[in-house]
């Protein structure tokens, strides 16, 4: 393998397929990981996936990926709109990072319109369903070339 991508999913994303399927669809977190892993394999890359409902675990994963991964795909969930600490961890990781949202936050409640993470992201993908993860992996693979 030519490198590893860190795939991070934040709070409540373990509930994909069950929580608000009218917004997030019926695909599960396992479907997301399988899709990202398959796309990465096409580029000779691996995926290391972590979902956590705890901000500190996501921060630790970013710190640990510094210098060992080629990039990060992150769906921070609700932390998108609140976490300066997660933004700082993305910056500290020095990884090219693609922010993904299954739904389009800009078409939802006002408080979802601001993203701290996007300040450090090389790209933001929103509203493409779980296909956004595939697009994100492809972006990172092409940045690596």
Curated annotation (Swiss-Prot):
Q: Which Gene3D superfamilies match?
A: Dehydroquinase, class II
Write the lineage as a comma-separated list: Bacteria, Bacillati, Actinomycetota, Actinomycetes, Mycobacteriales
**Enzyme class, UniProt record, top EC level:** lyase
Task: Note whether Amino-acid biosynthesis occurs among the keywords.
Answer: yes
Which keywords does the record carry? Amino-acid biosynthesis, Aromatic amino acid biosynthesis, Lyase
Which gene produces this protein? aroQ
User: What name does the UniProt record give this protein?
Assistant: 3-dehydroquinate dehydratase
For the site Transition state stabilizer, which positions are given?
19
Function recorded in the entry: Catalyzes a trans-dehydration via an enolate intermediate.
- Source taxon at top rank: Bacteria
- SS bond list: none
């Amino acid at each position: 393998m030519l490198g590893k991508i860190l795939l991070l999913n934040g709070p409540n994303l373990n509930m994909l397929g069950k929580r608000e399927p009218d917004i997030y669809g019926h695909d599960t977190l396992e479907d997301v990981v399988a899709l990202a892993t398959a796309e990465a394999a096409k580029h000779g890359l691996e995926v290391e996936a972590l979902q956590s409902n705890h901000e500190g675990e996501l921060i630790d994963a970013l710190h640990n990926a510094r210098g060992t991964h080629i990039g990060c795909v992150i769906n921070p969930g609700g932390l998108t709109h609140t976490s300066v600490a997660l933004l700082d961890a993305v910056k500290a990781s020095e990884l090219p990072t693609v922010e993904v949202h299954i739904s389009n936050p800009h078409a939802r409640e006002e408080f979802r319109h601001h993203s701290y993470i996007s300040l450090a992201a090389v790209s933001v993908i929103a509203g493409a369903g779980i296909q956004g993860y595939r697009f994100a992996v492809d972006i990172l693979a092409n940045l690596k070339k």
